[in-house]
C-alpha cells in the first residue's frame, strides 16, 4: 500500500512521468479525505465544475476518513514539529497523521513534509521535480 499526498495525485493527473513511473508499481493507493478536498479544490469555480465527476479522475485512490484517533496523532506530530521549529499547517498535520496511521510509505511531490519529526516516524518519499 502507498499513501499519496494531494501534491502527488495532482502531479499524476498532470501526467508527470516521474510520478507515474514511481507509482504505477506501488498499488493499492490510499489518501486522506482531506487530500481529496485539496485535489478537488483546484478545479473548483471552473465552468461546469462537478466534484463527483472530478473525483472519478482519481477514483483508483481510496480515501481514509479523519477521526478522533487521527486527531490525537496529528496533535502529537504537530507538537514534535513545533518543538523542532518546523510547524505544519493544520491540514498537513491531519494528512500526515492519516499517512502515519497506515504504516506505509507516504509519497509527496513537494517539500511540505520534509521535516525531521515526520521523517523520524514514517517513510516520506518526495517525487518533486523542477519543471
Task: Please describe what each predicted stretch is.
Residues 1, 100-131:
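Acidic, PIN/NYN-like endoribonuclease modules and their adjacent C-terminal/linker elements
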Residues 9-15, 35-53, 76-83:
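A short secondary-structure junction motif
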Residues 39, 89-105:
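Acidic, metal-associated active-site segment
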Residues 6, 68, 90-93:
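Conserved glycosyltransferase catalytic-site signature
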Residues 60-82:
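Acidic catalytic patch
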Residues 36, 71-74, 92:
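A general structural signal for well-ordered alpha-helical segments in protein cores
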Residues 3-4, 22-47, 62-69:
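PIN/NYN-family metal-dependent endoribonuclease catalytic core
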Residues 1-16, 31:
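Metal-dependent nucleic-acid phosphoesterase active-site entry motif
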Amino acid at each position: 500500500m502507498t499513501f499519496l499526498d494531494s501534491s502527488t495525485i495532482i502531479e499524476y493527473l498532470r501526467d508527470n512521468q516521474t510520478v507515474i513511473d514511481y507509482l504505477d508499481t506501488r498499488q493499492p493507493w490510499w489518501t486522506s479525505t482531506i487530500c481529496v478536498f485539496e485535489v478537488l479544490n483546484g478545479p473548483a469555480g471552473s465552468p461546469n465544475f462537478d466534484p463527483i465527476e472530478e473525483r472519478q479522475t482519481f477514483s483508483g485512490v481510496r480515501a481514509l476518513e479523519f477521526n478522533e484517533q487521527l486527531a490525537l496523532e496529528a496533535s502529537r506530530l504537530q507538537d514534535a514539529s513545533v518543538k523542532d521549529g518546523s510547524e505544519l499547517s493544520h491540514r498537513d498535520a491531519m494528512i500526515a497523521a492519516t499517512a502515519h496511521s497506515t504504516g506505509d510509505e507516504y509519497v509527496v511531490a513537494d517539500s511540505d513534509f520534509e521535516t525531521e519529526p515526520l521523517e523520524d516516524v514514517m517513510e516520506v518519499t518526495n517525487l518533486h521535480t523542477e519543471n
